[in-house]
Regions:
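Nuclease-adjacent, charged terminal/linker segments that flank catalytic cores
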Residues: 1-76
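Hydrophobic, Leu/Ile/Phe/Ala-enriched alpha-helical segments that form helix-helix packing faces
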Residues: 27, 42-46, 92-100, 152-159, ...
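Well-ordered, non-membrane alpha-helical segments in soluble/globular domains
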Residues: 37, 83-92, 144-157
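Solvent-exposed, charged helical/coil patches
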Residues: 64-110
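Active-site metal-binding core of divalent-cation-utilizing nuclease and nuclease-like domains
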Residues: 95-141
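A short, well-structured beta->alpha microelement
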Residues: 107-123, 145-157, 193, 197-200
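Catalytic cores of nucleic-acid endonucleases
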Residues: 132, 137-186
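Domain-level recognition of nuclease-like catalytic cores that cleave nucleotide substrates
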Residues: 174-205
């Protein structure tokens, strides 16, 4: 197995699915992997049934990806809103890692005090600081701010190893200017809203 294959398997085992466009963000600018080798490696892994490849064709508000989506052979196949949430989660991991950070934990559909969150991400930033964020991908414009209140109490009722109250990131196609007028801060945590294109991500996390 080549180094590139090992890296691809490690990435996709963490995020469960990733698009060809997301792969290019990781490997496209690395001189040790040219485009031809990258495409050849993906094709080889699909022909050997290590990966499965499906058309993506997602065009939803600010999130667009018309390339292909790759799954580990045997992994769950996402469709509809679940696919959008899965790919937005993968995009978050890709952007965090390509910015020089290192994702340590990545969980989908996590429970905190009987409330469901779409994602939990723990990563170290460029300076070695550990950061934790809870992420909700809101596609229905039904944001309930009360869900994020009293997090210091709620995180005690979770199997996730929180070491402090995490920040909250809500990914939404809604009107960000209106959302940013909400009372987003209390004494312990912050809620940040970001569009589906994840523009200005690092201003939020």
């Amino acid at each position: 197995m080549t180094n590139m294959e090992k890296e691809i398997l490690l990435l996709i085992s963490r995020v469960r699915c990733v698009t060809e466009a997301q792969f290019r963000k990781i490997y496209g600018d690395q001189k040790r992997y040219n485009k031809k080798n990258f495409k050849k490696t993906l094709r080889k892994m699909c022909s050997e049934y290590t990966l499965k490849k499906y058309p993506c064709d997602v065009d939803y508000y600010n999130y667009k990806d018309l390339s292909y989506v790759y799954y580990l052979n045997g992994s769950k196949l996402f469709k509809g809103d679940d696919l959008i949430k899965a790919l937005v989660g993968s995009e978050l991991v890709v952007r965090i890692n390509t910015a020089g950070c290192d994702v340590k934990r990545f969980y989908r559909n996590v429970s905190v005090d009987d409330m469901k969150y779409d994602l939990f991400i723990e990563y170290t930033d460029q300076f070695g600081n550990i950061k934790q964020i809870l992420v909700d991908v809101d596609l229905d414009n039904e944001i309930d701010i009360s869900k994020y209140e009293n997090l210091s109490r709620k995180i005690d009722k979770s199997t996730i190893p929180f070491f402090k109250v995490p920040n909250v990131l809500v990914v939404t196609p809604d009107n960000l200017s209106e959302l940013n007028d909400l009372d987003r801060y209390d004494n312990e945590y912050s809620i940040n809203f970001i569009d589906l294109g994840l523009n200005k991500l690092f201003n939020c996390i």
